[in-house]
Amino acid sequence: MFSLCFFTALITYYLYFNDIYLSNSINFIIFNNSILFTPTTTISLNDLKLLSIVLFILSDIITSNIISSKLTKLIPHHAKTKKQKSDATSDSLELYIGNSEANDLIKIPESGLYQNFLITGSIGSGKTSSAMYPFTKQLIEYSSSDSAKKLGLLILDVKGNYYLKVKEFAQNCGRQNDIIVIEPNGPYTYNPLDKPNLKPSVIANQLKTILLLFSPNNSEAYWLDKAETALCEAIKLCRMYNNNYVTFVEIHKLITDINYYHEKIKLLHSRFLDNKLSKVEIYDLLSAIKFFEQEFFALDLRTLNILKSEITRITNFFVSDYEISKTFCPPRENLSFKGFYDVIQSGKIVVLNMNISKYKNLSKIISAYLKLDFQTEVMSRLASDSYSDRPVAFISDEYSEYVTLTDSNFFSQSREAKCINIISTQSYTSLLNALNNKYSVEVIIQNLVNKIWFRSDDIFTIESAQKQFGKKDRTHISHTFSENAKQTNYNFITHSLNSKDSNISESINTSTQFDYIYDSNFFTKTLKTFSSLCFLTDGNKITYTGLINMFPYFK
């Protein structure tokens, strides 16, 4: 800014006064006592020209400094945002976070991005508009025109408005054709159970993990374990009679309708007699028959109904609504979204659009299943040479709605698979309320190295942040005033005490106390909207700790 002002003034000065510097003489016209006087004497011009140049340079430096400082104060954020927007599309993958207190631009390089982000803040603190939206925008825009480098993303939206911004960001950089919106009665169909490459036990365990979302106290372990076993055996049967294609509708029928079960067993028995089953299928068939006929259907009616109700907490959503069934239990030939392999290989953007206030637990089920599918596919990259090394990202607003215990394992290992995890939640307590296990919450928090704290009233969050920033010696000063009197009388007229021969003393005590760098008032009162405390890494070391003014997406 200073250089621009300085050289502008220099060029202007040259254009206006060039003729004077090239002349050999100058005539002065001076008004003195209202008498016009024109001297004919030619003064020495070399000294005059040299003096004028020196004076101009000095005045130009002073003026340029004043102008540039005023402009910097008026538009610091605008200028930095312009730089952010231009640099965000550079060849290097990095995220611009905001401005430090010294107005320096803070960014995180690619190696630091793979150590994940945890963003917390109370409602209205600006965590979505100044952190989640800008970060999402930058990741979508990265190498948007390069089919080999653009990122593949999974974005979960349980409020129903995030995907609108995603579509806007994608359209602005020409990636609108990369968007896959998963929503009821939408253009894409998705079957969470169509995973032919996974064993039935793995799929059943994923379903149990999702069931835990509806068991906040985790007090139903026995029923959940039994439900997992029943689901595993039902998936085995369904794969055998339904050409290796499993849906929630088929699982629901096998579990709740004993006549439907016998019908399918009869069909498989016929195939067995015709020698159309492989050895693996015969083993799975015998295992399923033994479980259902000797354990499941042999239970007393009350126990059986409890176990059925545990399983149908998931399956009922898919059989009771036509639009839901059409979208998430389609026939194989109508299946349009077949998983995250293409997302990773081609750089697609998958967005879930299901408002949790409208779809309740169904939104949690689909969100959690998309997340688990994405995590499984990402980790498969480590064991396969067929995958590209394209970076991918998982972005989740209101993460506490579908946090699962297995997430900590993924966050700890996803760095090697080049996955950027950015999650947002109101507080650590909201995660604790969902998992009901403080140690599991602490492990998840530990594996999200980059932390951004907006204004918060949550004690758990504040205390954890204070410990993260550490302590330092603080000087505490206390003033004490005292008054002593030899004789004090009470005045009944003025209702006051009158002292005689009194003296006043003052003492000042200074002490050093080892205390937190940021006290609780800083988190609850001092932090402004769109400002945050950050703990950031570049992948090798912690590079920045302190206050940052964020970049709201609308500025």
Predicted regions and their residues:
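Basic- and hydrophobic-enriched, low-structure N-terminal and domain-boundary segments
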Residues: 1-125, 129-135, 142-148, 500-507
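P-loop NTPase motor domains
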Residues: 73, 78, 100-104, 108-419, ...
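Switch/connector loops and helix/strand junctions flanking conserved nucleotide-binding motifs
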Residues: 162-165, 187-192, 430-434, 460-465
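Short regulatory helix/loop adjacent to the ATP-binding pocket of P-loop NTPases
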Residues: 166-170, 431-446
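Conserved P-loop NTPase motor module
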Residues: 310, 475-555
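Alpha-helix capping/termination and helix-coil
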Residues: 374, 378, 382, 403-406, ...
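Conserved H-loop
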Residues: 424-430
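Conserved P-loop NTPase catalytic core
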Residues: 438-479, 483
